[in-house]
Amino acid sequence: MGALTSPRKVVVLGSTGSIGLSTLSLFEESGAPVQILALTAGRNVERLIEQARRWKPSLAVIEDESRLDDLRAGLAGTGVEAAAGADAVRDAAAMGADWVMSAIVGAAGLAPTVAAARTGAVIALANKESLVCAGPALLAIAKAAGGSVIPVDSEHSAIFQVLQSECAHRVSRLILTASGGPFRTWDKAAMARATPEQAIAHPNWSMGAKISVDSATMMNKGLEMIEASYLFATPEDRVDVVIHPQSVIHSLVEYVDGSTLAQLGPPDMRAPIACAFAWPDRLPWPAPRLDLAAYGQLTFESPDVERFPAIGIAREALRLGGGAPAAMNAANEVAVAAFLDRRIGFLDIAGAVAGTLERMNSLGDLSVAESDAVETAMLIDGSARRIAAEVVAQKRQRA
């Protein structure tokens, strides 16, 4: 894509969540040339109505079918078509946009992201679960359709900007930074008593509840390791994690000659969204500027894998390959939901994920045929959720 002149046709999947809000905020502040074709949301019909009235998309979709009448009433007289359900979300993704923001949380984002990739659109990928569950297949689908996948996670956006594709064979390590989350300095006894309210209080980033809990367990970083391995064709043993509490350095690329390149910036998700929207151009907008003197110092430490076992679980899933990452992700979604519902403790989350992965591996349920990788990933997702629910129930009985 060259200079940003003519309007780009845009679909925002998950427009009412944190990333969706940041995307529309960026468009508002930058005056980016966009024509919104569709906005989709899960349950927040009030916010979706507000967005649709502002941006006048052709279509607004609420996944919760029970809210369709509310959506229609809220959009009466606007000319915006209202629809509901998972199929309608997939239809919105496949409308033929130039650029699709994939920001639906969880494995629910996989099918719409694949549908968008089949159209040849540029996929701005914030839904990390799509890559974790079916990364190689998703990337192949996008490439075959003439499209591309540009990561929106700040860590992968950093690597994307720093890593020159023609130099990929000269890379020795990818280094993902992690804030350490709200429990970075807590001991295990304190973590065992952690409440959902404490877990979602991220020190640097404004995120939804599920992603905030993933940051607290460091499963977020485990998922991102898998993403990085797939996105940048890098083996698991060459993807490292370092704790960087200030969240200023977003990731680093170490080359074989010992040189290390990093991308820096204030912790604001609109920056990687702007990169994904304009690449290889740059989008002028009133971005927060980095004042290194104000920070004074940037600090780093190794992750404590004993207190935060999720990183090791993710490495094991990546080593197992096949459907193991999809199973791990599904189990994590079930366990996090149980924690947010106060059915299990914070430290039970990683145990439930590890237990599910072990059971599925012992049953031989993790093999994936390349020809139907996406469909198989969805089946594995369902199986893992059922097993994870059993594991969670057992942990609750023992509590």
From Swiss-Prot:
Pathway: Isoprenoid biosynthesis; isopentenyl diphosphate biosynthesis via DXP pathway; isopentenyl diphosphate from 1-deoxy-D-xylulose 5-phosphate: step 1/6
Enzyme class: oxidoreductase
UniProt-annotated binding residues for 1-deoxy-D-xylulose 5-phosphate: K128, S154, E155, S179, H202, S215, N220, K221, E224
Cofactor(s) essential for the protein: Mg(2+); Mn(2+)
Alphabetical UniProt keywords: Isoprene biosynthesis, Manganese, Metal-binding, NADP, Oxidoreductase
Catalytic activity: 2-C-methyl-D-erythritol 4-phosphate + NADP(+) = 1-deoxy-D-xylulose 5-phosphate + NADPH + H(+)
GO-annotated molecular function: 1-deoxy-D-xylulose-5-phosphate reductoisomerase activity; manganese ion binding; NADPH binding
Domain of life: Bacteria
EC number: 1.1.1.267
GO biological processes: isopentenyl diphosphate biosynthetic process, methylerythritol 4-phosphate pathway involved in terpenoid biosynthetic process
Keyword Metal-binding tagged: yes
Annotated NADPH binding sites: T16, G17, S18, I19, G42, R43, N44, N127, E129, G208
Binding site for Mn(2+): D153, E155, E224
InterPro entries per record: DXP_reductoisomerase, DXP_reductoisomerase_C, DXP_reductoisomerase_N, DXPR_C, DXPR_C_sf, NAD(P)-bd_dom_sf
NCBIfam families named in the record: Dxr
HAMAP family, A to Z: DXP_reductoisom
Similarity-based family: Belongs to the DXR family.
Reported function: Catalyzes the NADPH-dependent rearrangement and reduction of 1-deoxy-D-xylulose-5-phosphate (DXP) to 2-C-methyl-D-erythritol 4-phosphate (MEP).
Name assigned to this protein: 1-deoxy-D-xylulose 5-phosphate reductoisomerase
Organism: Caulobacter vibrioides (strain NA1000 / CB15N)
Name of the gene this protein is made from: dxr
